[in-house]
From Swiss-Prot:
Belongs to the WXG100 family. ESAT-6 subfamily. Keywords: Secreted. This is ESAT-6-like protein EsxC. Coiled coil: none annotated. SUPFAM superfamilies: EsxAB dimer-like. GO terms for cellular component: extracellular region.
Length: 95
C-alpha cells in the first residue's frame, strides 16, 4: 500500500528531544543578550541610544517568538509520536 506511514519511534523521540533542547539553548542566548543589553543602559546614552535599545527590544521579541515556535514544534512532535504509538497499539489489539 502506498498510503502507509512508516516511522522510527526512537528517531522521532530523539528528534523531539533535540528540538526541545534547541529551544532551551535559544532561551539561554535570549537571557544573555537581554542581560547584556540592560547592562548597557548605564553606559550608553544620547540621541542614538534609544534607537539602539528599540532595535534590541525588537530583536529580542523576535527571538522570543522563535523560542516559543521551536519549543512548540518539539512538544507537538512528541505528542504526535505518543498518539501514533497509541494508535498502533490499539490497532494491534484488534487482531
Amino acid at each position: 500500500m502506498s498510503d502507509q506511514i512508516t516511522y522510527n519511534p526512537g528517531a522521532v523521540s530523539d528528534f523531539a528531544s533535540d528540538v526541545g533542547s534547541r529551544a532551551g539553548q535559544l532561551h539561554m542566548i535570549y537571557e544573555d543578550t537581554a542581560s547584556k543589553t540592560n547592562a548597557l543602559q548605564e553606559f550608553f546614552a544620547g540621541h542614538g541610544a534609544q534607537g539602539f535599545f528599540d532595535a534590541q527590544a525588537q530583536m529580542l521579541s523576535g527571538l522570543q517568538g522563535l523560542i516559543e515556535t521551536v519549543g512548540q514544534h518539539g512538544t507537538t512532535t512528541g505528542h504526535v509520536l505518543d498518539n501514533a504509538i497509541g494508535t498502533d497499539q490499539a490497532i494491534a489489539g484488534l487482531f
